[in-house]
């Protein structure tokens, strides 16, 4: 399956002809954003040369207190329309200007997700400093996760955003529309179900019992045909390479993490019993648990 940006094969996927699995461990979030938006890695320096304006930061700081208690996705939808009031350049819909607006939105989302006050050295660094400041190893993991989720061109979230973009809306409005779709049960709801399943399972010794209980109850996620939450993908018949890589990277950094050990057992049992492999959502939830990210952290990275 192929679009203007992404190509999916049975076991790989590509951004503008570049293997996304390789990009996840060799390039920065900013470089991959430049590739997706312009087709050129080197455009990173010009696109990300400007920080958020003082007026945008002032607006963000003013509403920070009202974001307390919200999940990152909820906070995004509160913050974006308000900060957009101070970004008049967002109404410039020429391709280069839209890409530059995209960089400002990325910087803003990184701050909102983590409750940060000022953008730091790159998107991944901002997220790591806000969520896992005590562990520099988390930066590479978070960067890989963001890159693996950089383009969602084939799902309903992106389709919604494209429809809004086709009406000549600003990038802020486009992103807000995509976030609305993302909060549905097929995305945010899916990560919540995975989290609930892992909490219920609790330990590797309970995995087979938990899977058996799911099978007996006949539970599934509408539209995905999954029995075990986070497994099976219609786009990847031999397994979602994004989920596989993210699980491997997390295990390399935190091999003894209870979250990793549980995920490994779930993966083994599900493949043995059902022949299904983990999706990107399962990888994100496992990484979020290993890093002890706040509620909603996994789906925020997907966004």
Describe each PLM feature range.
Residues 1-303:
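Hydrophobic alpha-helical bundle cores within soluble ligand-binding/oligomerization subdomains
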